[in-house]
Amino acid sequence: MGRVKLEIKRIENTTNRQVTFSKRRNGLIKKAYELSILCDIDIALLMFSPSDRLSLFSGKTRIEDVFSRYINLSDQERENALVFPDQSRRPDFQSKEYLLRTLQQLKAENDIALQLTNPTAINSDVEELEHEVYKLQQQLLMAEEELRKYEPDPIRFTTMEEYETCEKQLMDTLTRVNQRREHILSQDQLSSYEASALQQQQSMGGPFGNDVVGGWLTENGPNEAHLFDASAHSAMYETLLQGSSSSSNQNNIMGESNVSNHNGDMFQEWAQAYNSTTAHNPSTLFPPMQHQHGLVVDPNIEEIEIPVMKKDAQADHEVSDYDIRMPQLSSQ
């Protein structure tokens, strides 16, 4: 019995459909290979399996080249090249339109690929970049040549002039480096001096110390003139009293104590009167002071005359007092 002829229609079973494709694919590829060898033709075979796996075959020419030849054909040639097993069957118009759109897309992609691979289609930006790279390479070579001057190779020198020139360049460079170093050191010292001066000025509270004096005197305060208290006045005038008493004792020829005691009583009365006056109204002696041009100025200052006896008048008074008291003492 012969083989049963398989009806040409779609196989419904998925497994059977995949098995049938695998068997007939190998036979189709074998026939295409034999045809390309025997007839020396360009052939391209493109297949997708039921599981969407791609299968390709091409002869001695790449499949891309075969498709390019097909894309470059005219529409009339493409239409005449369509071959159908059943001659009574006509091509579907919608399938033809879809195929044409696909072919036009492939042709556009092919044109882009040819334009990119064409040496004459180099972009101007690429030329500018190449020119910039060339310039940078030249600058790099020049910089390397300049650096070689600071690390000379004695083997390359052949004359004394070259040695002297190299020595002069190195000495000039060393001089510039030292000058730059001194400049930086001077700038650092100046900045440190300014910082210390500013810190000292801030610690003093002002350039002339006015803040220190201003701390003593409260502006418009009631006690701004009380620089010294009553005890300080008493101590000061007690010292003056002692000094006056000692000077009067030196001027006294007889050296008796009653004369010095008499003078002491006079000064004590005067000191007590002064202390009582300053205790009641101390501001009369030291009125409010003002600052003018960094100095302390008292606008109400007046000259005060202190009643101090001259030495000659004081001596005459003491002698007369002595003459009066001597008869009294002798009578006692």
From Swiss-Prot:
Tissues where this protein is expressed: Expressed in pollen.
Q: Which cysteines does the record link by disulfide bonds? A: none
Q: GO BP, one example?
A: regulation of pollen tube growth
Pfam families reported in the protein's UniProt record: SRF-TF
Q: What happens when the gene is disrupted?
A: No visible phenotype under normal growth conditions. Pollen grains from the double mutant agl66 and agl104 have severely reduced viability, delayed germination and aberrant pollen tube growth.
Q: Which PROSITE patterns match?
A: MADS_BOX_1, MADS_BOX_2
Q: What keywords appear on the UniProt entry?
A: Coiled coil, DNA-binding, Nucleus, Transcription, Transcription regulation
What protein am I looking at?
A: Agamous-like MADS-box protein AGL66
Organism of origin is: Arabidopsis thaliana (Mouse-ear cress)
